[in-house]
């Protein structure tokens, strides 16, 4: 994972239907190339292969199930995510929570498959626990702020700093990013100022009227513009 980074979690918004997921990924790639910024996109599973074949920027899955391939109706093992072209996976988002042993299983298997991992956590203590598993990155997102427009970096800056320090104490190789309520340039700039190396953003981008303008706005602080 190249940092500083902007990770776009597309979630399952209706804007992605009918080719929207591919279009958004292509816009993200255009901005990444224009600014020289690191941008990762995470489309719904149903569009993973289509998006991965349409862009050269990293594509992550939004989640995975802690199971091996086999008689697993409705489950999505990591092997299938990798086969679809993803280079990483988001684990334990607040909208798709897992038990600690399941998180550990996914992180370990992802390493064996050469997939990057971003483990989401709600607070500094959970972030430290996640860091002990040695994922690629930990993304601290207070669930009460997700989708509110009240950014974690400006609403709870002390929690962001505490998370950065907690993760460093456990494993200095684990990258720390943050998310929840990230809406504009200042939110991202503040997150970087507080010691993180990136942000995880969803609705602010997917629901924006002008995807290119919004992604550009949020990516500029990552490259010092």
Swiss-Prot record:
One of its GO terms (cellular component) is cytosol. It catalyses: D-glyceraldehyde 3-phosphate = dihydroxyacetone phosphate. Its EC number is 5.3.1.1. It is found in: Cytoplasm. GO terms for biological process: gluconeogenesis; glyceraldehyde-3-phosphate biosynthetic process; glycerol catabolic process; glycolytic process. Signal peptide: none annotated. Pfam families: TIM. InterPro entries: Aldolase_TIM, TIM_sf, Triosephosphate_isomerase, Triosephosphate_isomerase_arc. Its main location: cytoplasm. Involved in the gluconeogenesis. Catalyzes stereospecifically the conversion of dihydroxyacetone phosphate (DHAP) to D-glyceraldehyde-3-phosphate (G3P). Belongs to the triosephosphate isomerase family. This is Triosephosphate isomerase. The lineage of its organism: Archaea, Thermoproteota, Thermoprotei, Thermoproteales, Thermoproteaceae.
